[in-house]
UniProtKB/Swiss-Prot annotation:
Residues 106-135, 136-165 form the 4Fe-4S ferredoxin-type domain. This is Ion-translocating oxidoreductase complex subunit B. The keyword Metal-binding applies. Its cofactor is [4Fe-4S] cluster. [4Fe-4S] cluster 1 binds at residues 49, 52, 57, 73. Binds 3 [4Fe-4S] clusters. Gene3D superfamilies: 3.30.70.20, Electron transport complex subunit B, putative Fe-S cluster. The keyword Secreted does not apply. [4Fe-4S] cluster 3 binds at residues 125, 145, 148, 151.
Length: 185
């Protein structure tokens, strides 16, 4: 019985020593991150889609902080560009000099008759916009899909294609300056 108690005490002492060492290391060897990068990262949509040319939102936030253009986030859209411009204290790029023109909104579409239910697209989707179960057909939730195109390549049957969404009043780019509107007093 004494041996068991001794072993428990030794393990408790080791756990206490290692806990103190880890606590000391966490305090004294802490890596400080740039607060502007943290703020930029919080503004980005966190889809980790890679459409900006970076492997995720955090590396793109670091690139913006180092002077890269602020208009490469396609899923974030114009509102994200405006928020980043406000944070950085710069003017958002206008449509004429925009470095990366946002392509028309596209979403993934699964041809369900070709889907074998392998779940590779579900694993590749960064925003969980694909529902389905193994060995059953899968479906895309259009409202959740960001159009990142990451689900297309893993599909072994090529049953996923990117389709352009039709123009609707919700997504139409209204040019208010050319619409003849008269203010009624």
């Amino acid at each position: 019985m004494n041996h068991i108690l001794l072993i428990i005490l030794i393990f408790a002492a080791l756990a206490l020593i290692f806990g103190l060492l880890l606590g000391f290391a966490a305090i004294h060897f802490k890596v400080e991150s740039d607060p502007i990068v943290d703020q930029l990262d919080a503004l980005l949509p966190q889809t980790q889609c890679g459409q900006c040319g970076y492997p995720g939102c955090r590396p793109y936030a670091e690139a913006i902080a180092n002077g890269d253009s602020i208009n490469k986030c396609v899923p974030g859209g114009a509102q994200t560009i405006q928020n980043i411009a406000d944070l950085m204290g710069v003017e958002p790029p206008s449509d004429d000099n925009e470095l990366l023109m946002a392509p028309p909104k596209r979403v993934a579409f699964i041809h369900e008759n070709l889907c074998i239910g392998c779940t590779k697209c579900i694993q590749a989707c960064p925003v969980d916009a694909i529902i389905g179960a193994p060995k059953l057909m899968h479906t895309i939730l259009r409202s959740e899909c960001t159009g990142c195109d990451l689900c297309v390549d893993p599909c072994p049957t090529n049953c996923i294609e990117m389709i352009e969404l039709p123009a609707t009043p919700d997504r139409w780019k209204w040019d208010v300056e050319t619409i003849p509107v008269r203010m009624v007093q």
